[in-house]
Swiss-Prot record:
InterPro entries: Asp_de-COase-like_dom_sf, CT_Nitrate-R-NapA-like, MoPterin_dinucl-bd_dom, Mopterin_OxRdtase, Mopterin_OxRdtase_4Fe-4S_dom, MopterinOxRdtase_cofactor_BS, Periplasm_NO3_reductase_lsu, Prok_molybdopt-oxidoreductase. It catalyses: 2 Fe(II)-[cytochrome] + nitrate + 2 H(+) = 2 Fe(III)-[cytochrome] + nitrite + H2O. Transmembrane segments: none annotated. HAMAP family: Nitrate_reduct_NapA (MF_01630). This is Periplasmic nitrate reductase. Binds 1 [4Fe-4S] cluster. [4Fe-4S] cluster binds at residues 48, 51, 55, 83. Component of the periplasmic nitrate reductase NapAB complex composed of NapA and NapB. It comes from Vibrio vulnificus (strain YJ016). SMART domains: Molybdop_Fe4S4. The lineage of its organism: Bacteria, Pseudomonadati, Pseudomonadota, Gammaproteobacteria, Vibrionales.
């Protein structure tokens, strides 16, 4: 069908309205694919490839290439807007150094760890991989192999990879890069509510009276959502915006109140607010008595370091997540020391400002939306910080109603939909199930048609532990997909690079571009990107969105899904399962892992005829792969509070927020009348907990593992900028974005620069015990640190700033703290 873009947009609007009303439209109006007569550009919808906001874009293709993108005016998330990265989506797939065929390190015609990258066929690549995997399995067993995935995997890619590792290879050594960004949020949700992901949604932006950003720079990291806050603030004079951070950034420009606090002291600020609420009789007793219980967190739990690290040895209760029941009076006593005087002293924030913030939470007539992302989660006490903010909302009853929302934002397009909901973490299964729970394993084994005892009960190696196990030669075969951890992860020189180059190990990296991670590998597999494949993402508000493949891949590049499924064909079940399992499931004897995982009568039950647009993966395997995987995965959540709609529905809408029950999405969870799982008459029902009550968890301030001293006298904070996404793999290959911000710089306070004899543009050496980098100084611009702190973004592959970061983690979530470590700054002569 041919139509103008205007007609296309009108048809989309009509289709959306008709879907709500249950009306069937003529094909010309219902079709979500269109072509412009004037330009011969075909348009289709897709979620943006970048952050976790989940904007929808219209993608224009011509002659097999993406030639244009624009904001989707029918999308409820972004309403036609895109940030600057989204506007240049059409260029991310066409960098000059795009990888087009497998590359294996070779010397004298065969694989060699010290050889040069040499083009090989897919058969040679997979044969080499399979040989290494089989040798490792035979010698050391399934714990010697591992996989590091991504919050950028599609739902189907993550599901297939997790199934291959946990059911096929029987190894839980799979973890996503979301471990570095969302793990503390996950554990915070699970401890407080017993179920993951926000209870609110983006509609809260249009209802809140006060916005509190806990360490988040939404103006640059979630700019489209920031426009909704901006619109709310500028059109409603009573609305207040509060921004808390360790340095000044662009979000402060809109703020009514800005709070620059000392690193780690957010713990003290949050506890002060809880104390203020109690002391000023602002507790919502009806809510607290009916819907909460009180717990005390175990303290002095260490920093997730190696067991022989002196800092870890000092901990009295290393890695303990235990909690004990306490009364309200005991909780009150635990926060009493956090007076305004004490909180001000610890944080550096003026007393009157702290009281101003606390009053907004305490006022029963003020609807408050708390927002956070990496500033809170990348924290050695990130789980505690998540809990402390929930405490404030629970004490006041400001939760799960329009405008009252503690909202954890995500940084990747499917950190929620894939990493969390699918369960690609080393300890998880789909729909909030975990490998350590025998009932959960039994559910997974039933859905996957596995004999009892297939899935190992012990969690696998998490991301940071994977690096250590590679370093120590315990983990020997390792597959990295859809991330650039050699640039993004911490302590590169100390753990990761030695692990990748360990002669005992074989490292495979699937990526579209020759990243720092790819260059450290032994085998590079070229990967299809974004709309070169069909897929689905899940965004920060529980919205699942799907898209069709719209262009072919470049060269011999293949999707991560194709790679996982095709690789599984290289293994007979006798090579991956012990005899006792095969004896329980003799039907799998002589079969391949592919037969067991994907040709199981469930994944392969949808014929190609059901695919409205045929995609390369489905064409290759002979059935509608994406639908089969999605529908099998959805079985985990339906009826368990994670209900998803039928797969085909997602291609007709701009996403739906789960749980989707009887065709209706859920905006506010846990609230009677909004959430179908909330019991009638309950008011609120936190059904993730057996008694339907959320937990208010007491946790104190505890110091970071390292602090500045006489030698390393400055704090270092790393992060992002508006124009680049994560390590810049895609955005630095977009000419306009590269020209806008070509290099990372060291943002420093002018007085700190002056004290070191530095001027703007001077080159400095930033160093600590873990390494050093050279970077130029910036004393002006968007980021303005206080004295004693520098900020350096990590998008620049020439400046591997994260190699200075200690691989300390929150002991409960295993998430790294990228926001504070001591360094020294010296001028390069």
């Amino acid at each position: 069908m041919k139509m103008t873009r205007r007609a296309f947009v009108k048809a989309n609007a009509a289709a959306s309205a008709a879907a709500v009303a249950g009306i069937t439209l003529p094909a010309s109006a219902a079709n979500l694919i269109a072509s412009s007569d004037q330009t011969k550009i075909t348009w289709d919808k897709a979620p943006c490839r970048f952050c976790g906001t989940g904007c929808s874009v219209l993608v224009g293709t011509q002659n097999g290439k993406v030639v244009a993108t624009q904001g989707d005016p029918e999308a409820p998330v972004n309403k036609g807007l895109n940030c600057i990265k989204g506007y240049f989506l059409s260029k991310i797939m066409y960098g000059q150094d795009r990888l087009t065929q497998p590359l294996l390190r070779m010397k004298d015609g065969k694989y060699d760890k010290e050889g040069d990258f040499t083009p090989v066929s897919w058969d040679v690549a997979f044969d080499t991989m399979a040989e290494k995997w089989k040798a490792s399995l035979a010698k050391k067993g399934p714990t010697s192999i591992g996989m590091f995935g991504s919050g950028q995997w599609t739902v189907m890619e993550g599901y297939a990879a997790a199934k291959m590792m946990k059911a096929g290879f029987r190894s839980n050594n799979i973890d996503p890069n979301a471990r570095h960004c969302m793990a503390s949020a996950v554990v915070g949700f699970m401890r407080t509510f017993g179920i993951d992901e926000p209870m609110g949604c983006y509609d809260d932006f249009e209802h809140a009276d006060s916005f509190v950003l806990w360490g988040s720079n939404m103006a640059e990291m979630h700019p489209v959502l920031w426009t909704r806050i901006t619109d709310r603030r500028l059109s409603h004079p009573h609305v207040k915006v509060n921004v808390l951070s360790t340095y000044y950034h662009r979000s402060f420009e809109l703020a009514d109140s800005g709070y620059i606090f000392k690193p780690q002291s957010d713990l003290a600020i949050a506890n002060f607010i809880a104390n203020y609420i109690i002391q000023n009789d602002a507790v919502n007793w009806d809510f607290v008595n009916k819907h909460t219980n009180f717990k005390q967190a175990t303290t002095d739990i260490g920093y997730g370091l190696r067991d022989d690290d002196p800092l870890q040895k000092q901990a009295k209760n290393p890695n303990s997540g235990n909690m004990t029941s306490i009364s309200f009076e005991e909780y009150k006593k635990s926060v009493a020391p956090y007076t305004v005087e004490k909180a001000s002293e610890m944080s550096g924030v003026a007393q009157d400002k702290l009281i101003e913030l606390a009053k907004q939470y305490a006022d029963p007539n003020t609807k408050v939306m708390s927002l956070w992302t990496m500033g809170m989660n990348q924290h050695t006490r990130g789980v505690w910080m998540n809990s402390l903010v929930y405490n404030i909302h629970l004490l006041t009853g400001k939760i799960a109603t329009p405008g009252n929302s503690p909202f954890s934002l995500t940084g990747q397009p499917s950190a929620c939909g894939t990493a969390r909901e699918v369960g690609t973490f080393a300890h998880r299964l789909p729909a909030d199930m975990v490998v350590a729970n025998p009932k959960h394993r039994a559910i997974a084994e039933k859905i996957w048609k596995l004999p009892e005892g297939t899935i190992p009960p012990k969690p696998g190696f998490h991301a940071v532990l994977q690096d250590r196990m590679l370093h120590d030669g315990v983990l020997n075969c390792y597959w990295v997909q859809c991330n650039n951890n050699m640039q993004a992860g911490p302590n590169i020189n100390g753990e990761r690079l030695p692990g990748y180059r360990n002669p005992e190990n074989f490292i495979v990296v699937s990526d579209p571009y020759p990243t720092a991670t790819a260059q450290a590998a032994d085998l590079i597999l070229p990967t299809a990107m974004w709309i070169e494949k069909e897929g689905a993402y899940g965004n920060a508000e529980r919205r699942t969105q799907a898209w069709y493949q719209q262009v072919g891949t470049v060269g011999e590049a293949k999707s991560d899904l194709w790679q996982v499924m095709e690789f599984s064909k290289r293994f007979k079940m006798e090579e991956v399962w012990p005899e006792e399992l095969l004896a329980k499931a003799p039907q799998y004897r002589g079969k391949t892992m592919y037969d067991m995982l994907f040709a199981n009568g469930q994944v392969d039950k949808f014929p190609l005829s059901e695919a409205r647009q045929l995609n390369d993966d489905s064409h290759h395997f002979g059935f509608y792969v994406q639908k089969g995987l999605f529908e099998e995965y959805a079985e985990f959540g339906r009826g368990h509070g994670h209900d998803l709609a039928p797969y085909d529905v997602y291609h007709t809408v701009r996403g739906l927020r789960w749980p989707v029950v009887d065709g209706k999405e859920t905006l506010w969870r846990y609230k009677e009348g909004s959430d179908p799982y909330a019991k009638k008459g309950s008011g609120w029902d936190f059904y993730g907990k057996p008694d339907g009550k959320a937990l208010i968890i007491s946790a104190p301030y505890e110091a970071p593992p390292e602090s500045p001293d006489a030698e390393y006298d400055m704090w270092l904070c790393t992060g992002r900028v508006l124009e680049h996404w994560h390590t810049g793999t895609m955005t630095r290959r977009v000419p306009e974005l590269y020209k806008a911000v070509p290099d990372a710089v060291c943002y420093i306070h002018p007085e700190d620069a002056k004290a070191r004899g530095l001027r703007r543009g001077d080159e400095v050496l930033i160093s600590n015990k873990r390494g050093e980098v050279r970077v130029r100084v910036e004393t002006r611009g968007r980021n303005r640190p206080p004295q004693g702190l520098v900020f350096v973004p990590f998008f620049d592959a020439r400046i591997l700033i994260n190699k200075l970061i200690l691989d300390a983690t929150d002991p409960l979530s295993k998430q790294t703290d990228f926001k504070k470590c001591p360094v020294k700054i010296t001028k390069v002569a």
